[in-house]
Amino acid sequence: MAAAARARVAYLLRQLQRAACQCPTHSHTYSQAPGLSPSGKTTDYAFEMAVSNIRYGAAVTKEVGMDLKNMGAKNVCLMTDKNLSKLPPVQVAMDSLVKNGIPFTVYDNVRVEPTDSSFMEAIEFAQKGAFDAYVAVGGGSTMDTCKAANLYASSPHSDFLDYVSAPIGKGKPVSVPLKPLIAVPTTSGTGSETTGVAIFDYEHLKVKIGITSRAIKPTLGLIDPLHTLHMPARVVANSGFDVLCHALESYTTLPYHLRSPCPSNPITRPAYQGSNPISDIWAIHALRIVAKYLKRAVRNPDDLEARSHMHLASAFAGIGFGNAGVHLCHGMSYPISGLVKMYKAKDYNVDHPLVPHGLSVVLTSPAVFTFTAQMFPERHLEMAEILGADTRTARIQDAGLVLADTLRKFLFDLDVDDGLAAVGYSKADIPALVKGTLPQERVTKLAPCPQSEEDLAALFEASMKLY
């Protein structure tokens, strides 16, 4: 038996042991050391759902001023980026603040694909401003930057790495109260309006990492489908690929009751807890919407129905993955975007090389799901069927190949670049890509099967070409 196969067998046996019956009759079978957790288990026994309040409706952004007035806000920071600052989403939000007599200051220096430096600049602005509420109008980069600014302005004596996820940071629980934050998403991808996650490039190590805590999730998400009409086609596509992979990955994460360690205190239960019955519902519903509406949303900028559904799908998938988590597509995407050389994506008005997040995630998806289908193959076939595959005669052992082929066709139909080679990578870059994936354990450990460095290298190599 190959070493990798032996490792997976051993892994499965450990999971079966950890998931042993805990009823009074059988709980003595696997005795646990006292004090490990309230249940005495080494794997978790509970999950919880934490999500922002969300409000959906065409033109709902006009209510943001009333919301802040109801909160008693007197000094608001409105964060956005320079591309959006003169466009309707920001103008509508500012008009609402003015109409309701809310004093505000605009910060428009958000960086698309933020870095620790751009986070620190926004944090310094927030600390000096002493704001009592925040509004983030933009995509995931803006919402994540605003979350970080709110957190560190509320905890001014903390070191930046205190709240950054391990192993780069200390991953400390957030114990300070934060100010209200209203998120107004203008792209349909990250679902950041629903999650307690803020992602950035850590420049010193050239890796992406995040701050993950329920405490930083927005107080309210205003999901206004009118904002989707300004998005260029490739922005719609790449944002949609993020929704696609949020749904696929969260549905196939390690189940919550197999995740270890079991927390000794609920405050240390991670935001990403593994698949569970509630997150599963949101993931599958989001996937059905992507299958039905993403191509329409990309191909017709005036298709408000399709773009509205994708805006909701982003939030639905956010509710799912924001609690279940994601795994290899996202873990491997961070070095893909972080180590970018010269590639600049179409329809993105930026002054630096950029592999958009959704594109960096989806390029590895066929290889990843071929690999993960060794666990939960039924779920992989179910997802393939939702995306249009005829699975009536498919063999269960071919689940990964069926899903991979279905994804390739889906991506080809949407003119996705032909693999990592098309965005500037070669086999010579694989060691660096693997090295950049290793710190992403907050997500890679949620993959349904373990992966070695050799496995990761093989996945990157298989992703060099898609078609």
UniProtKB/Swiss-Prot annotation:
<dbReference type="GO" id="GO:0005759">
    <property type="term" value="C:mitochondrial matrix"/>
</dbReference>
<dbReference type="Pfam" id="PF25137">
    <property type="entry name" value="ADH_Fe_C"/>
</dbReference>
<dbReference type="GO" id="GO:0005739">
    <property type="term" value="C:mitochondrion"/>
</dbReference>
<dbReference type="InterPro" id="IPR001670">
    <property type="entry name" value="ADH_Fe/GldA"/>
</dbReference>
<dbReference type="GO" id="GO:0019552">
    <property type="term" value="P:glutamate catabolic process via 2-hydroxyglutarate"/>
</dbReference>
<dbReference type="InterPro" id="IPR042157">
    <property type="entry name" value="HOT"/>
</dbReference>
<comment type="similarity">
    <text>Belongs to the iron-containing alcohol dehydrogenase family. Hydroxyacid-oxoacid transhydrogenase subfamily.</text>
</comment>
<dbReference type="Pfam" id="PF00465">
    <property type="entry name" value="Fe-ADH"/>
</dbReference>
<dbReference type="InterPro" id="IPR056798">
    <property type="entry name" value="ADH_Fe_C"/>
</dbReference>
<keyword id="KW-0597">Phosphoprotein</keyword>
<keyword id="KW-0809">Transit peptide</keyword>
<feature type="modified residue" description="Phosphoserine">
    <location>
        <position position="452"/>
    </location>
</feature>
<comment type="function">
    <text>Catalyzes the cofactor-independent reversible oxidation of gamma-hydroxybutyrate (GHB) to succinic semialdehyde (SSA) coupled to reduction of 2-ketoglutarate (2-KG) to D-2-hydroxyglutarate (D-2-HG). D,L-3-hydroxyisobutyrate and L-3-hydroxybutyrate (L-3-OHB) are also substrates for HOT with 10-fold lower activities.</text>
</comment>
<keyword id="KW-0007">Acetylation</keyword>
<keyword id="KW-0560">Oxidoreductase</keyword>
<dbReference type="GO" id="GO:0006629">
    <property type="term" value="P:lipid metabolic process"/>
</dbReference>
<dbReference type="GO" id="GO:0046872">
    <property type="term" value="F:metal ion binding"/>
</dbReference>
<dbReference type="GO" id="GO:0047988">
    <property type="term" value="F:hydroxyacid-oxoacid transhydrogenase activity"/>
</dbReference>
<keyword id="KW-0443">Lipid metabolism</keyword>
<dbReference type="InterPro" id="IPR039697">
    <property type="entry name" value="Alcohol_dehydrogenase_Fe"/>
</dbReference>
<protein>
    <recommendedName>
        <fullName>Hydroxyacid-oxoacid transhydrogenase, mitochondrial</fullName>
        <ecNumber>1.1.99.24</ecNumber>
    </recommendedName>
</protein>
<feature type="modified residue" description="N6-acetyllysine">
    <location>
        <position position="445"/>
    </location>
</feature>
<dbReference type="GO" id="GO:0006103">
    <property type="term" value="P:2-oxoglutarate metabolic process"/>
</dbReference>
<keyword id="KW-0496">Mitochondrion</keyword>
<dbReference type="GO" id="GO:0004022">
    <property type="term" value="F:alcohol dehydrogenase (NAD+) activity"/>
</dbReference>
